[in-house]
UniProtKB/Swiss-Prot annotation:
Cellular component aspect of the GO annotation: cytosol
The entry's keywords: Amino-acid biosynthesis, Aromatic amino acid biosynthesis, Lyase, Tryptophan biosynthesis
Reported function: The alpha subunit is responsible for the aldol cleavage of indoleglycerol phosphate to indole and glyceraldehyde 3-phosphate.
Principal EC category: lyase
Record's protein name: Tryptophan synthase alpha chain
EC number assigned by the record: 4.2.1.20
InterPro entries: Aldolase_TIM (IPR013785), RibuloseP-bd_barrel (IPR011060), Trp_synthase_alpha_AS (IPR018204), Trp_synthase_suA (IPR002028)
Functional pathway: Amino-acid biosynthesis; L-tryptophan biosynthesis; L-tryptophan from chorismate: step 5/5
Catalytic activity: (1S,2R)-1-C-(indol-3-yl)glycerol 3-phosphate + L-serine = D-glyceraldehyde 3-phosphate + L-tryptophan + H2O
Signal peptide: none
Organism: Xanthomonas campestris pv. campestris (strain B100)
Domain of life of the native organism: Bacteria
Family the entry assigns: Belongs to the TrpA family.
Length: 272
């Protein structure tokens, strides 16, 4: 089959040339409703998103805090499994052929699907990358090889506790972008970001990595996004956005909440 277009690289190239930072919102597919996922994705792009991370609902999301755990449970209760997520991206691509979409999730659903079959199906649907939070880099060679063959980026995670040997491996094999978790813990758990420590690490990573470096975990609003973006190529916002969408009463409300939440972050990043 033909390789996927490299939308992630094109996105970061365009941002670099315009002196802007990537804004990467995370939402759980299927929450606040099955019908809202694609309209919310389009709303986020209108509000200034450059890349969308779409969470694949999973029954045991060990890296996620209570906000995303509850979101995942609600989505699973509506039947939002891997097949639904792939179909949602297919629908999104009917109107948006350029915004990169990255799936974030766990290894088990992909292994059940079959890694090669999943990779081919994902690329055909218009998915650009996958971040598997429970796939150790030391065990990722086979998955990366399959993904690389079809043009699907295997996005890697680094954290403040990542050892130097593993960090060397992550930097040398980084695809799409390297996701730096700005503190140790589960998503949504940080009350206060240590931006100074994170900035030092981000500068080191950007000097070493063969891909852009984005920061996430603990970014809740425009101020924290702007602070973290100074030494990163972009920022990811997840739990705070998921919480803002959680009790949207209908698709229109979900769209409006998505735009209202993201626009101040876009403005703050562009002002910086």
């Amino acid at each position: 089959m033909s390789r996927a277009p490299d939308r992630i690289a094109a996105c970061f190239d365009a941002l670099r040339h315009s002196g802007r930072k990537a804004l990467i919102p995370f939402i759980t597919a299927g929450d606040p409703s099955l019908e809202a996922t694609v309209p919310v994705m389009h709303a986020l792009v209108r509000a200034g998103a450059n890349i969308i991370e779409l969470g694949v609902p999973f029954s045991d999301p060990m890296a996620d805090g209570p906000t995303i755990q509850r979101s995942s449970e609600r989505a699973l209760g509506r039947g939002a499994g891997l097949a639904y997520v792939i179909e949602a991206v297919q629908e999104f691509r009917r109107e948006d052929a350029t915004t990169p979409v990255v799936l974030m999730g766990y290894l088990n659903p992909i292994e059940i699907h079959g890694t090669r079959r999943f990779a081919e199906t994902a690329v055909a649907a218009g998915i650009d990358g996958v971040l598997l939070v429970d796939l150790p880099p030391e065990e990722a060679d086979e998955t990366r090889a399959i993904f690389t063959e079809v043009g699907l980026a295997l996005i890697a995670l680094a954290s403040p506790t990542t050892g130097e040997a593993r960090l060397d491996m992550l930097c040398s094999t980084a695809q799409g972008y390297l996701y730096y978790v700005s503190f140790s813990g589960v998503t949504g758990a940080a009350d206060r970001l240590d931006t100074h420590a994170a900035s030092d690490r981000l500068r080191q990573l950007r000097a070493r990595a063969g891909a852009p470096v984005v920061a996430g975990f603990g970014i809740k609003d425009a101020a924290s996004a702007a602070a973290m973006a100074v030494d990163a190529d972009g920022v990811v916002v997840g739990s705070a956005l998921v919480a803002a969408l959680a009790d949207a009463s209908d698709v229109r409300s979900a769209r409006e909440r998505a735009e209202d939440f993201l626009q101040p972050l876009r403005q703050a990043l562009d002002a910086g």
